Design a protein with these regions (language model features):
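N-terminal auxiliary interaction/assembly segments of multi-subunit proteins
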Residues: 1-143
Length: 143
């Protein structure tokens, strides 16, 4: 599978998630390789480790305000830290699960882990290509 098609898999997963879960379209910016400069990390980050033929991490990182509005769009009234953590992990898990449909059963995904704080760094192994898919939704930006 070409790199362009691999990226397209994640772009489609992002667009589908927002269309389905919050029933409001997101806009995906131009994906880019995050070489030399780490990507922006926001208040909450959900991470899924990938093993099998592909190795790496799929993550979704977003500001608290964006996640809160997403919960409201889902008719959720609980804006607790625990629920924000659940949501960011769910998004990362859904994006990974959708990608697994394209990549096949050798795209093995872990359960989500969640970290908070903008000082978090997302590490990657030297033999992976860190690709960032910028997401704009309403007035918010995420990766």
């Amino acid at each position: 599978m070409s790199l362009q098609r691999e990226i397209g898999t994640f772009v489609a997963a992002v667009l589908n998630y927002f269309d389905t879960a919050v029933q409001q379209a997101a806009v995906v910016g131009t994906p880019y390789l995050a070489l030399g400069k780490p990507p922006d990390i926001f208040d909450y980050t959900g991470m899924i480790r990938i093993s099998g033929k592909k190795k790496g991490v799929v993550y979704f990182t977003a500001p608290k305000g964006m996640l809160s509005v997403m919960l409201m769009r889902m008719q959720e009234t609980d804006m607790s830290d625990a629920n924000l953590r659940d949501l960011v992990g769910e998004v990362a898990n859904t994006l990974s699960g959708n990608a697994r449909k394209d990549f096949g059963r050798n795209f093995i995904i872990s359960t989500p882990s969640v970290v908070t704080g903008t000082s978090t760094t997302i590490g990657h192994s030297p033999d992976t290509r860190p690709i960032v898919v910028p997401i704009d939704w309403r007035t918010y930006h995420a990766n």
